[in-house]
């Protein structure tokens, strides 16, 4: 069985997440061994939150779940590519389709290139 080399990377492996239908890059996150095993077993993208220090099933709060369509591993076994079906239209916790919604202009300023899919204040209120 192919497994990411968690030992080489200090226990966390980066994951680039891409829309399987369009090729759009949605986000970058990290997984540990438990998140890897949970993702394989459930078919839903499960990551490890470095700030909360716990597993995080993408979309469990917002409903914007990522269904795994394909997983690829790089030649060094230390980076993954999740190709997903993005349910609900937004991968970013700030309400955008992609976490890469800001274009950096030549002068160093930022320009938002996407419309918000949802209002985070409404979705994540406690």
From Swiss-Prot:
Keyword Repeat: no
Cofactor section: Mg(2+); Zn(2+)
Superkingdom as given in the UniProt entry: Bacteria
Predominant place of localization: cytoplasm
Catalyzed chemical reaction(s): 1-(5-phospho-beta-D-ribosyl)-5'-AMP + H2O = 1-(5-phospho-beta-D-ribosyl)-5-[(5-phospho-beta-D-ribosylamino)methylideneamino]imidazole-4-carboxamide
GO cellular component: cytoplasm
UniProt xrefs under Pfam families: PRA-CH (PF01502)
UniProt KW keywords: Amino-acid biosynthesis, Cytoplasm, Histidine biosynthesis, Hydrolase, Magnesium, Metal-binding, Zinc
EC number: 3.5.4.19
Residues annotated for Zn(2+) binding in this entry: 75, 92, 99
Gene3D superfamilies: Phosphoribosyl-AMP cyclohydrolase
GO BP terms, alphabetized: L-histidine biosynthetic process
Cofactor binding description: Binds 1 Mg(2+) ion per subunit. Binds 1 zinc ion per subunit.
Role: Catalyzes the hydrolysis of the adenine ring of phosphoribosyl-AMP.
Similarity comment: Belongs to the PRA-CH family.
Listed name of the protein: Phosphoribosyl-AMP cyclohydrolase
Organism from which the protein derives: Desulfosudis oleivorans (strain DSM 6200 / JCM 39069 / Hxd3) (Desulfococcus oleovorans)
